[in-house]
């Protein structure tokens, strides 16, 4: 499944709508998506939304749509 993650780049500063960023990632469920972002970034997650159907098709039309991947931390 594809998830849209809205976040702030910093966990210290209070969230502001004007500074909210977005990333897209593929994960098995919303918990796995949150874990991936929390384990690999310092971001303050505001919202994680599953994208399906028309919502996914709409987001894919954006030139900013790109799936984010994280390197595995397995040794």
From Swiss-Prot:
Keywords from the UniProt entry: DNA-directed RNA polymerase, Nucleotidyltransferase, Transcription, Transferase
Any Pfam family: RpoY
Main EC class the enzyme belongs to: transferase
GO biological process, alphabetically ordered: DNA-templated transcription
EC number: 2.7.7.6
A GO CC term attached to the entry: DNA-directed RNA polymerase complex
UniProt-listed InterPro entries: RpoY (IPR009907)
Entry GO MF terms: DNA binding; DNA-directed RNA polymerase activity
Catalytic activity: RNA(n) + a ribonucleoside 5'-triphosphate = RNA(n+1) + diphosphate
Coiled coil: none
Homology family: Belongs to the RNA polymerase subunit epsilon family.
The protein's assembly and partners: RNAP is composed of a core of 2 alpha, a beta and a beta' subunit. The core is associated with a delta subunit, and at least one of epsilon or omega. When a sigma factor is associated with the core the holoenzyme is formed, which can initiate transcription.
Function (record text): A non-essential component of RNA polymerase (RNAP).
Name of the featured protein: DNA-directed RNA polymerase subunit epsilon
Taxonomic lineage from the root: Bacteria, Bacillati, Bacillota, Bacilli, Lactobacillales
């Amino acid at each position: 499944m594809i998830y849209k993650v809205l976040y702030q780049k910093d966990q210290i500063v209070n969230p502001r709508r004007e500074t909210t960023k977005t990333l897209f990632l593929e994960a098995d469920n919303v918990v796995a998506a949150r874990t991936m972002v929390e384990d690999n970034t310092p971001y303050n997650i505001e919202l994680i939304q599953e994208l399906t159907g028309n919502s996914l098709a709409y987001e894919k039309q954006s030139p900013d749509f790109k799936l984010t991947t994280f390197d595995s931390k397995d040794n």
